[in-house]
């Protein structure tokens, strides 16, 4: 039976990582319990340092319950703030704490930890939270710029109700994981997701039932693991807009092909890897009708095969990136077929398109509770239990060819 303090693991982006969580005395410190548990859901091993002011907002006992870790407030002989950590997250980061750090005032274990992390190159992320008038003050802006110049990531939310509130825990942990995991070996990834459509007339379209959820989960997972992601989205069942990603909407199959080529060839984006998780139409309308067809009309729709977009991606990447081109990963969905047929279809795509790997699944797996997909390469077939497993497999391929 799970204990009250336990959490359910959602991902592995912080697995095995020693994270120092710093809490200063802003009112946003009341969010620490939720933030700490979200860190743990992604595998983080946490140690906590609070300022005295923070203990007036939330008790060390509550923080210890949430983190299942030691909580330091006062100086002690262990000097845990100088231990080796994989990353330092300061949330909330008050102006007072930032000013002390920038100006070398070292009157608390937290400020010492910030200085030590800066000195030894440990990734640092600060999350300021304050009223707009304080945030917009020139002194605050200078402090934030200086913190960023010293290598820290500064995560600021949009203004809401006259305040820069602390972002939600899911967003904070996602950005912190990305900052912690980002290295020179990580890729600039283009992910195609969602369904495509072909116009019947000016109102109606032929489309498919793809929601885009799997593709977006892959984007989220790859971002947390340190990759930079650009999204080319077709038709989805949800709003794909997310400040972490550059998002292009192109539900039309033909325009999606043009956008994919343009994005790969865009020097500013530097795309070197493609994940083609979109359900791109195999057939499109031979010719669309103008206006709106009458509901009394008997329709005889002519559909023609649409060229496979993925067939050009390896070539586009190779021409643009040369030896720096990363892998292309395709997706293959069948219905009612056995594993042998799935593997055969996936390897046919590998041979035809030159992709490095294919995520192959049956539609019943997508809708069921069992295994999620097969990971198929030229020489390997393995089972993937869930979307997180798909992310891990793709990440391993990206880093292996980095």
State where each predicted segment sits.
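A cross-family phosphate/adenosyl-ligand binding-site feature
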Residues: 1-402
């Amino acid at each position: 039976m799970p204990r009250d303090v336990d959490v359910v693991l959602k991902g592995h982006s912080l697995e095995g990582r020693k994270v120092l969580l710093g809490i200063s005395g802003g009112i946003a410190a009341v969010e620490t319990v939720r933030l700490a548990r979200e860190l743990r859901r992604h595998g983080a091993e946490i140690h906590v340092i609070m300022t005295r002011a923070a203990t007036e907002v939330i008790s060390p006992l509550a923080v210890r319950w949430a983190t299942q870790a030691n909580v330091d407030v006062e100086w002690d002989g262990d000097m845990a703030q100088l231990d080796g950590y994989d990353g330092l997250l300061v949330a909330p980061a008050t102006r007072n704490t930032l000013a002390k750090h920038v100006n070398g005032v070292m009157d608390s274990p937290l400020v010492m930890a910030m200085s030590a992390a800066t000195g030894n190159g440990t990734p640092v992320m600060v999350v300021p939270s304050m009223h707009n008038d304080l945030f917009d003050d020139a002194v605050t802006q200078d402090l934030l710029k200086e913190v960023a110049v010293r290598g820290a990531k500064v995560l600021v939310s949009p203004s809401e109700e006259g305040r820069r509130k602390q972002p939600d825990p899911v967003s904070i942990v996602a950005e912190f994981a990305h900052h912690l995991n980002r290295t020179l070996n990580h890729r600039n990834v283009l992910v195609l997701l969602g369904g495509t459509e072909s116009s019947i007339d000016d109102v109606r379209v032929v489309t498919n039932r793809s929601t885009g959820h799997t593709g977006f989960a892959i984007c989220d997972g790859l971002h947390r693991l340190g990759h930079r992601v650009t999204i080319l989205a077709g038709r989805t069942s949800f709003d794909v807009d997310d400040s972490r990603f550059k998002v292009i909407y192109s539900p039309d199959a033909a325009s999606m092909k043009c956008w994919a080529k343009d994005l790969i060839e865009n020097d500013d984006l530097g795309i070197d890897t493609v994940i083609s998780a979109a359900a791109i139409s195999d057939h499109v309308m031979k010719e669309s009708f103008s206006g709106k067809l009458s509901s009394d009309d008997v329709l005889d729709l002519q559909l023609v095969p649409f060229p496979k977009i993925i067939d050009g991606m390896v070539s586009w990447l190779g021409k643009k990136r040369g030896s720096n081109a990363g892998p292309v990963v395709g997706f293959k969905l069948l219905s009612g077929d056995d594993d042998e047929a799935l593997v055969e279809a996936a390897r046919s795509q590998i041979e035809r398109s030159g992709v490095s790997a294919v995520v192959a699944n049956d539609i019943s797996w997508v809708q069921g509770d069992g295994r999620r997909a097969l990971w198929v390469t030229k020489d390997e077939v393995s089972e993937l239990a869930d979307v997180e497993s798909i992310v891990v497999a793709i990440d391993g391929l990206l880093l292996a060819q980095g």
